């Protein structure tokens, strides 16, 4: 009986018909791809892209030179040099470098920072022509923070209930 059923299936091309029907359904379904350079999909608030150093609303940089991000970085991509203590007892960085070639975008630096100074922003389009352009210094990181501050603040606020 099973052999008769199998012969009927192959004679009537049941598998072919079901596969063809599936192909036709997928052919006329809406496309799932985006035309990337011209269309961009949504980015999660937790997306880890290009690094940035943030400032307070009064313009002062947030980094207090605690060096927690440097200590926790598994790739040892962060180098910080702290300046002398100021009159109010706080410190600021003299040098803050990130080697983006070494960085593995794990987000540990962002999680370790007690003042949300170093963040990974929403920018994922930072391809360069030379390797040297991927060595970010403090000025480059602060410029990134200034450029993306609105989006970074929105993403941190959206993620705040889960921290």
Curated annotation (Swiss-Prot):
Q: What are the EC numbers?
A: 7.1.1.-
Q: How does it assemble?
A: NDH-1 is composed of 14 different subunits. Subunits NuoA, H, J, K, L, M, N constitute the membrane sector of the complex.
UniProt keyword list: 4Fe-4S, Cell inner membrane, Cell membrane, Iron, Iron-sulfur, Membrane, Metal-binding, NAD, Quinone, Repeat, Translocase, Ubiquinone
- Keyword Ribonucleoprotein among record annotations: no
Residues annotated to bind [4Fe-4S] cluster 2: 73, 103, 106, 109
A GO MF label? iron ion binding
Reactions that this protein is recorded to catalyse? a quinone + NADH + 5 H(+)(in) = a quinol + NAD(+) + 4 H(+)(out)
Name of the protein in question: NADH-quinone oxidoreductase subunit I
Q: What does the cofactor section's free text say about binding?
A: Binds 2 [4Fe-4S] clusters per subunit.
What does this protein do, in the record's words? NDH-1 shuttles electrons from NADH, via FMN and iron-sulfur (Fe-S) centers, to quinones in the respiratory chain. The immediate electron acceptor for the enzyme in this species is believed to be ubiquinone. Couples the redox reaction to proton translocation (for every two electrons transferred, four hydrogen ions are translocated across the cytoplasmic membrane), and thus conserves the redox energy in a proton gradient.
- Cofactors that this protein relies on: [4Fe-4S] cluster
Membrane topology, as annotated, equals: Peripheral membrane protein
Gene Ontology CC terms:
plasma membrane
Provenance organism: Brucella canis (strain ATCC 23365 / NCTC 10854 / RM-666)
Pfam families linked to this entry: Fer4_7 (PF12838)
Q: Where does [4Fe-4S] cluster 1 bind?
A: 63, 66, 69, 113
Q: Which InterPro entries match?
A: 4Fe4S_Fe-S-bd (IPR017896), 4Fe4S_Fe_S_CS (IPR017900), NADH_quinone_OxRdtase_chainI (IPR010226)
In this chain the 4Fe-4S ferredoxin-type domain maps to 53-83, 94-123
The principal location of this protein is membrane
GO BP of this protein: aerobic respiration
The record's subcellular locations are: Cell inner membrane
What's this protein's family per the entry?
Belongs to the complex I 23 kDa subunit family.
């Amino acid at each position: 009986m099973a052999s008769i059923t199998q012969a009927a299936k192959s004679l009537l091309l049941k598998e072919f018909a079901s596969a063809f029907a599936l192909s036709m359904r997928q052919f006329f379904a809406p496309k799932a791809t985006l035309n990337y350079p011209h269309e961009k999909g949504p980015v999660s608030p937790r997306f880890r892209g290009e690094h940035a150093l943030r400032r307070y609303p009064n313009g002062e940089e947030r980094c207090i030179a605690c060096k927690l991000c440097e200590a926790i970085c598994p790739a040892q991509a962060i180098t910080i040099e702290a300046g002398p203590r100021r009159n109010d007892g706080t410190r600021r960085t003299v040098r803050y470098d990130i080697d983006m070639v070494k960085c593995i975008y794990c987000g540990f630096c962002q999680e370790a920072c007690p003042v949300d100074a170093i963040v990974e922003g929403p920018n994922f389009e930072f391809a360069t022509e030379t390797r040297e352009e991927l060595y970010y210094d403090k000025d480059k990181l602060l410029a990134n923070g200034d450029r993306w501050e609105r989006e970074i603040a929105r993403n941190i606020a959206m993620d705040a209930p889960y921290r």
